[in-house]
Each structure stands twice: as structure tokens, then as C-alpha cells.
Amino acid sequence: MKALFLVIFAYLLGSITFGEVIAKLKGVDLRNVGSGNVGATNVTRALGKKYGVLVFFLDFLKGFIPALIAVKSFGIDSWVLTFTGLASVLGHMYPVFFGFKGGKGVATALGVVFAVSPSVALFSFLVWLGIFLWKRYVSLASITATISAFLFLFVAGYPVNVLFMAIVIGALIIYRHRENINRLLTGREHRF
């Protein structure tokens, strides 16, 4: 029963779209600004770096807190961790409180990975930073870091439930970036 409550908690916490909440408090409708996304990147474009960093941190915590509880309560090799991590990211992408229209899940996924392995999260962030500084595309950096996280977890020998979680979350993140991928391939993606 505790496991079920944790998964539900993870989804509901993930469903709090902090970008949208903060933007509304500032009188901005993110759906009508920039990319229309509710994540940290669009918040940065619409409200500035201070609010973008705040949203990134809050979205990160949405993944980190439930995943850390799962790791501490059930162990890293427990499928409870897998479903908790997935629920956090799915909540962010498809939030019940905001008409199932959320963000792309990158910061929330990073929080999940950090709860599993701070070193893998750090390496993935460094990959993101390197690609971003080189190409100035947030989407390309996010996709590359997502793939890198799975590879780092695989090489480090993490259990199958963690690898499964990383594959599913990675596939969801790439799917949520499908329009960005199309724009990257056609040279129409916006640089940051």
C-alpha cells in the first residue's frame, strides 16, 4: 500500500506545473509566449533567468523527492523506484491539474536520476552543458543528455529496473521533443 501511495504522490507532485504557476503569478500565459511550453527554458525566455532557474530547481525536486523516498524505502533495485520515477515524469508531462498539457520532463527526469546516482546526473548535466555551449540548442542538449544518462547507468551496471526506467523516460523525453527534432533537421530550431 505504501508503494501505491508513493507512486500516486509522485504523479500528483509531478503534476504541479511550477512554470505555469509562477508565470500566472507574474501575469504571463506561457502557452502564448515563446515556444508555448511550461518548462524552465520557456520561463527563462518569458520571465528571465532568475525565474527560469527557480522553475528548473522546482521541477528537479518533483523528480528527486519521490525517487529518493523510493530508494530509501524500497531500495535501488525495487520496481517501486521504477514506477515512482515514471510517475513523476509523466505527471510533469501530462499534469492532471493543467489539462494534461505539461512540459518535456528534462529537469524532473534529472531529479529522478540524481536520486539514483548523483554522479550519473552530474555527468549527464555536463553533457547537456557541453552540447548547449557548443550548439546553443537546448533541445539538442536535452536529447543528448537523456541518451547519455541511460548509457552512463548501463556502463555503471545499474539494475534492470533502473535501466528500464531510464529507457522509458528517455523515450518519453525524445517523443516530447519530436517537434524540436523536426525543426533541428530542417534548420528551423531556435537557438538560445
Swiss-Prot record:
- Please give, as recorded in its UniProt entry, the membrane topology of this protein: Multi-pass membrane protein
Pathway annotation from the record: Lipid metabolism; phospholipid metabolism
* GO biological process terms, semicolon-separated: phospholipid biosynthetic process
What is its subcellular localisation?
Cell inner membrane
Q: Name one GO molecular function term.
A: acyl-phosphate glycerol-3-phosphate acyltransferase activity
Name the InterPro entries for this protein: G3P_acylTferase_PlsY
Reactions that this protein is recorded to catalyse:
an acyl phosphate + sn-glycerol 3-phosphate = a 1-acyl-sn-glycero-3-phosphate + phosphate
Its main subcellular localisation, reduced to a broad class, is membrane
Instruction: Please give the function described in this protein's UniProt entry.
Output: Catalyzes the transfer of an acyl group from acyl-phosphate (acyl-PO(4)) to glycerol-3-phosphate (G3P) to form lysophosphatidic acid (LPA). This enzyme utilizes acyl-phosphate as fatty acyl donor, but not acyl-CoA or acyl-ACP.
Q: Which NCBIfam families match?
A: glycerol-3-phosphate 1-O-acyltransferase PlsY (TIGR00023)
Q: Which family does it belong to?
A: Belongs to the PlsY family.
Q: How does it assemble?
A: Probably interacts with PlsX.
Q: What is this protein called?
A: Glycerol-3-phosphate acyltransferase
Source organism: Aquifex aeolicus (strain VF5)
The gene for this chain is plsY
